[in-house]
């Protein structure tokens, strides 16, 4: 039977995902075949596998840390909020339907047999599975039908480590409260506690650690410092923490419009790590100003976000940027927003039949019930690009518009179809390709065009590979965890040797 270790947290954003990723990296470094698993994830940032399956980004990060190709079995259930009340339910990479919280709470138990089946498949292929929970295991109003915290731990008989965030304050109360709210059989599964995001002298914590160990009878197996790491996050909390101001030490100012239903903000990580680029996220009340590049990102609800742009005043600022000659780039939902009209005849996103777009591109989009999920290779001005598509709309271009690229391969099969649009002599571009800025040479060429436009010399040898960058960050994360966790005790927990 495969060995397992489950990482749960006292709350959302306690650091479960990053701790799980770091453990995956450590086990890989130690020569073990390790794979991540999260039965149910809620996020707007998603990824398309080579087979065309949609999954959560956190498990993609963990898979990369483990040295494994992302596989939808690592995240069988993905919930993508479409409004404040509903989420799109994606199961094993494919859309089931939209459900509200009550409907999904009643339905999700039906998914357990298949969740267990794919877990067992991963177990047959690996030495260790690192399982991540969601939110808190002490949500006592939801525990009767839980499939992602203690419900999952019981399903596969996994020992649990509890992660608590000290940065927000009240860490000992959160540890004690979480454990005390559990029924006795669940408490027995908690084999260790990790205090995460600590700043200062660990010695000052010792008396509190001694007391919480006495109260809970659970050992604290590590205190992890607040580390300066740059690792993809799928949590909307991370977006709130991103910069809203231009870093004057950088040459290029790139502004990303923070849509209300913004999705896949990981598209811009490759830009954030470039030495000459400052990426800022514009929210209502912030001035867009005159950036070197304005980006409209992906959206899970383009109709709602068009209304948001109008009501917030951002629409007027975007159109002013167009008049000032600012380069504008739309990705997926952002590309749809640049068009003249978005139609929703089946009411997939709202009660409206249609809404106008920004009217910058001569395009019209019709939302459709079947989601396109593909990994693609495309040609843009003779240059090969790689990316992935996640969208439910089909966009028609006016005859005089040129496409941004030609898709040559999707999910490993040859094809030929246009993608995106280019207008205003290249000033405005739109594409359905997520991850387009991960294409290193094309991105540097694009950034150099922005540099030349403002009288700066191009950078020729400043190529920062997102893959190499990520690998360095995963190794740094593993180093931090090795220095701050009792790895001997963690291995004892995994091997059921704990005292």
Curated annotation (Swiss-Prot):
Superkingdom of the source species: Bacteria
Keyword field: Cobalamin biosynthesis, Glutamine amidotransferase
Associated pathway: Cofactor biosynthesis; adenosylcobalamin biosynthesis
GO biological process, one term: cobalamin biosynthetic process
Keyword Transcription tagged: no
Ranges for domain GATase cobBQ-type: 251-442
MF terms in GO: ABC-type vitamin B12 transporter activity; catalytic activity
Annotated catalytic residues: 332 (nucleophile), 434
The keyword Metal-binding is annotated on this UniProt entry: no
Matches recorded under InterPro entries: Class_I_gatase-like (IPR029062), CobQ/CobB/MinD/ParA_Nub-bd_dom (IPR002586), CobQ_GATase1 (IPR033949), CobQ_N (IPR047045), CobQ_synth (IPR004459), GATase_3 (IPR011698), P-loop_NTPase (IPR027417)
NCBIfam families the UniProt entry points to: cobQ, PRK00784.1
Functional note: Catalyzes amidations at positions B, D, E, and G on adenosylcobyrinic A,C-diamide. NH(2) groups are provided by glutamine, and one molecule of ATP is hydrogenolyzed for each amidation.
Similarity section: Belongs to the CobB/CobQ family. CobQ subfamily.
Protein name: Cobyric acid synthase
Lineage of the species this protein comes from: Bacteria, Bacillati, Bacillota, Bacilli, Lactobacillales
Gene: cobQ
């Amino acid at each position: 039977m495969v060995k397992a270790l489950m990482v749960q947290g006292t709350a959302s954003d306690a650091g479960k995902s990053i701790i799980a990723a770091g453990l995956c990296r450590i086990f890989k470094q130690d020569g073990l075949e390790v794979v991540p698993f999260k039965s149910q994830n809620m996020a707007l940032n998603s990824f398309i596998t080579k087979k065309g399956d949609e999954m959560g980004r956190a498990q993609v990060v963990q898979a990369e840390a483990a040295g494994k190709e992302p596989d939808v079995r690592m995240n069988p259930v993905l919930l993508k909020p479409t409004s404040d009340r509903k989420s799109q339910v994606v199961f094993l990479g494919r859309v089931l339907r939209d459900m509200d919280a009550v409907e999904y709470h009643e339905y999700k138990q039906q998914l357990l047999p298949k969740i267990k089946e794919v877990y067992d498949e991963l177990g047959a292929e690996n030495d260790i599975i690192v399982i991540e929970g969601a939110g808190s295991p002490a949500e006592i109003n939801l525990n009767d039908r839980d499939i992602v915290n203690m419900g999952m731990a019981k399903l596969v008989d996994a020992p649990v480590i509890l992660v608590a965030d000290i940065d927000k304050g009240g860490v000992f109360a959160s540890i004690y409260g979480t454990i005390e709210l559990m029924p006795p059989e669940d408490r027995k599964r908690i084999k260790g506690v990790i205090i995460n995001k600590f700043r200062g002298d660990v010695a000052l914590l010792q008396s509190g650690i001694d007391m919480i160990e006495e109260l809970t009878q659970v050992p604290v197996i590590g205190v992890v410092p607040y580390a300066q790491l740059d690792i993809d996050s799928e949590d909307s909390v991370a977006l709130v923490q991103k910069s809203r101001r231009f870093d004057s030490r950088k040459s290029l100012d790139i502004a990303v419009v923070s849509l209300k239903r913004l999705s896949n903000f990981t598209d811009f990580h490759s830009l954030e790590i470039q030495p000459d680029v400052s990426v800022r996220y514009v929210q209502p009340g912030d001035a867009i100003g005159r950036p070197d590049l304005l980006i409209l990102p992906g959206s899970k609800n383009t109709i709602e976000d068009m209304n948001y742009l109008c009501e917030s005043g951002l629409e007027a600022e975007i159109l002013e940027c167009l008049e000032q000659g600012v380069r504008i780039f739309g990705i997926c939902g952002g590309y749809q927003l640049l068009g003249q009209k978005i139609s929703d005849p089946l009411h997939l996103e709202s009660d409206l039949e249609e809404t106008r777009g920004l009217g910058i591109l001569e395009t019209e989009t019709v939302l459709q019930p079947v989601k396109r999920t593909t990994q693609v290779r495309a040609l843009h001005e003779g240059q090969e690009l790689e990316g992935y598509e996640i969208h439910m709309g089909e966009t028609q271009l006016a005859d005089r518009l040129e496409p941004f690229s030609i898709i040559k391969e999707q999910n490993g099969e040859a094809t030929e179809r246009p993608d995106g649009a280019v207008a205003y002599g290249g000033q405005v571009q739109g594409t359905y390709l997520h991850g387009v800025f991960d294409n290193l040479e094309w991105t540097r060429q694009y950034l150099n065009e922005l540099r030349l436009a403002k009288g700066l010399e191009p950078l020729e040898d400043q190529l920062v590979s997102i893959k190499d960058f990520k690998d360095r960050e995963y190794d740094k994360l593993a180093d931090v965890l090795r220095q701050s966790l009792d790895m001997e005790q963690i291995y004892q927990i995994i091997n059921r040797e704990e005292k």
